[in-house]
Amino acid sequence: MPFTLGQRWISDTENELGLGTVVAQDARMVTLLFSTSGENRLYARTDAPITRVMFNPGDTVTSHEGWQLLIDTIEEKEGLLTYIGTRLDNGETGCTLREVLLDSKLTFSKPQDRLFAGQIDRMDRFALRYRARKFYSEQFRAPWNGLRGIRASLIPHQLHIASEVGQRHAPRVLLADEVGLGKTIEAGMIIHQQMLTGRAERVLIVVPESLLHQWLVEMLRRFNLHFSLFDDERYSQSLLDSDNPFETEQLVLCSLDFVRRNKERLTHLTEAEWDILVVDEAHHLAWSETAPSREYQVIERLAHHIPGVLLLTATPEQLGMQSHFARLRLLDPNRFHDYQAFADEQQRYRLVADTVGLLLNNELLDAAAMTLLAEMLGGQNADALLARVNEQNAADDDARRRLTAMLMDSHGTSRVMFRNTRQGVKGFPARRLHACALPLPAQYQTAFKVAGIMGGKQRLDESARHMLYPEQIFQQFEGQNATWWNFDPRVQWLVDFLLDLRQEKVLVICAHAGTALQLEQVLREREGIRAAVFHEGLSLVDRDRAAAYFASAEDGAQVLLCSEIGSEGRNFQFASQMVMFDLPFNPDLLEQRIGRLDRIGQNRDIQIHVPYLEQSAQAVLLRWYHEGLDAFEHTCPTGRALYDETYQTLQGYLAEPGALTGLTAFIHDCRARHDALKAQMEQGRDRLLELHSNGGEPARVLAQTLAEQDNDSQLVNFALNLFDIIGISQEDRSDNLLVLKPSDHMLVPDFPDVSEEGCTITFNRDQALAREETQFISWEHPIIRNGLDLVLSSESGNSALSLLKNKALPVGTLLLELIYVVESQAPRNLQLNRFLPATPLRLLLDKNGTNLAPQVEFEQFNRQLNAVKRHTASKLVSAVQPEVHGMLTHGEHLVAEQAQALIDEARAQADLLLSAELSRLKALRAVNPAIRDNELEAVAENRRQVLRHLDEASWRLDAIRLIVVTHQ
């Protein structure tokens, strides 16, 4: 290379150094000073990874003094360049600027500038960049964006609710599905979709203390949402660094008690500007018109300040009308301000729901029903449908379906409440109880007597709880080393049971972590039974390992021993055998235990085994659960209400299991009350609301569509290519698993979500569900999204040169591949990506400016190309630079027409969709006051802003590749 002192060069490998100046040279070496960074670099003359910087007429350059020059001509003298042109600051013409006086901060980021400066990327990076642009555009256009990346089964009713609510502005809804139908997953899906689409950025979740860990695990494992758990310690520490600790995190999880106990915390929470508030177990917020509870007031204050609110609650039939009204009042106090008016309205809608039953059952409608429907659907042009509804032909069916859909839209609370029932969803397995009575050991009888003598001052409920766990009482008196497992018949029963079911996975749940640990030791030492232990003392990583050990079909544990708290938030549908080593003290916990297996997706009947001690509190509680509530073999929506009603009596029987006078009558009374309440709930079912909540056939189609997206071969190929280029090592494991680890040649020193220890991934949803430690990779996973951002936010791959071996074309023939991006810069919450995501337009030009891209598909063409060494590529570019400039000019003219057509199409689509939604809501507002005024205003303003930003959309060159034909 010919070097001259004062020449300007740029580093091919360290672009961030800026413009370098030749300050020394000899026969073998050359020294460059990069004054921006104050660093020198010494290179070998013959093979230096640097490129001569030479600008062209028409370019604009900046002097070291800051003024800019539009170049007209260039002079070269003794190897040094002088640029002559017009100063842009004062208009002076004929100005000169020697290259040594160019601004050293200059870097090349535009694709054409990097190409001409010799900063040419590898061919595979150009291909990855184009694929990233293409896939990014396609994924954001998909209507299901935000729904498919969850690590959960694709359940139609859950997808319907998430899709319906997740696309709203500041949704305020009540999620009231029956237990086991996935309210937590629905809330997580809504949060995930709102965040992915830019509608929300800051989320606050408030739950009972006992559910904190469950929510933390669910949000992380299923949705890749990293919530920060705030407790007293975390809050106090954060106060040292911030005036408002809650502003230090975007996603916060805390308990209701944590908020309730401190007025300052509540003030800080209300000032932190959240987008969404999520409240679990909202039915425990006690309210009356004259005396609302402190808990209710806390949530009411938060709900007043936070635009989006999701309340997770028991079904309205369980709560009673007034309690249900209290929940709705939190969502929309203007709409639900008068309880009596609400009760009257609900009675009116009850008549509508009954009429819907006639529609769904294909029964004829009498005059009263027709009048009611006409009144309810006034203003919606339903007269023609009503006239056809009693006709006995196919049109009749169509009219009934359309009328039902219109009623769902106009239903009183259908926009603010979703409630699915097991009866409506179907697909659940049967539950079978296998109770095994075992003799009460003498050691426990003695311990009970001693406890009775010594615990005379205990509260009744404390005494009752102690009596449920005799091994705990025995250890209190004999010490922690007491070997209760040597005489407790439940232990030997468990050993024999597991030996009989060697080929089955068995979940064992007990109340205390200590019991689980002791049982694992016994199983291991007595019979060598492989068991994993799961309790609250384990870290999240250790729990994952235990769950994975249990899930492994080949060499995994036969049994998983869980404590009560440790099992929260984990589901094991692949197992169907459950052993309750003891019983929990309330029906909610019992259902929570069974719910570890009894989930949608369970394909076998659940066998519930309860070894219990005769003449003990366990025997009493077993009878009450089974005979009084039917809580083992069916879900028990009445359980909590009856538990609260009968609390004192039940605790008395549990505290003194030997005094059973009247127990049978008590249990019979409970069963009668249970049956009556259940019948009352069934009678109160709102079929219209259920129909609206489960989504019907469209929800099933959505689930099927998403299922077809799983195992997308394009995603797999793109991800593996991405990992290779970023420098993430991949180790194949069995069962479609990959282990990702950072390598020594990473593009970035620290890639998010890939730790030093590595992470296990799969592209298979079922595999991810079966193995807790495995991450489910989709287009929405942070690893893929961060990889896309890494590629597209840098210059990587935006400049390339390739050789095309084709003897049908003359040697030296030039082709220019141009990737333009059409985009609109707008706030994320407008979701312009629905209409115009950053969309690539590809041109493939010959020397005459003819676009060959429609005839030459990218992937097929790319496979015919060969790489070329960088120095050779740099020389080739320099030799043909004038021709490339001309081809670029042709490209600018060609792309303008295509880009504007794309923008016009996006604007028309946005106008059509958003105008239709606004018109629909305005029409419904007349018959459904649940549609809020601010929601209408938000939709109208959203439409205006979207159309304005689409009008301002533009395009730019994102990547360039020069192709040179060769015959070698």
Curated annotation (Swiss-Prot):
Gene Ontology terms, MF aspect: ATP binding; DNA binding; helicase activity; hydrolase activity, acting on acid anhydrides
Keyword Nucleotide-binding attributed: yes
Signal sequence, renumbered to the chain: none
Keywords of this entry: Activator, ATP-binding, DNA-binding, Helicase, Hydrolase, Nucleotide-binding, Transcription, Transcription regulation
SMART domains the record matches: DEXDc, HELICc
Entry annotated with the keyword Nucleotide-binding: yes
InterPro entries recorded: Helicase_ATP-bd, Helicase_C-like, Helicase_RapA, P-loop_NTPase, RapA_C, SNF2-like_sf, SNF2/RAD54-like_C, SNF2_N
EC nos: 3.6.4.-
Family stated for the protein in its record: Belongs to the SNF2/RAD54 helicase family. RapA subfamily.
Function summary: Transcription regulator that activates transcription by stimulating RNA polymerase (RNAP) recycling in case of stress conditions such as supercoiled DNA or high salt concentrations. Probably acts by releasing the RNAP, when it is trapped or immobilized on tightly supercoiled DNA. Does not activate transcription on linear DNA. Probably not involved in DNA repair.
Name by which UniProt lists this protein: RNA polymerase-associated protein RapA
Organism (species): Sodalis glossinidius (strain morsitans)
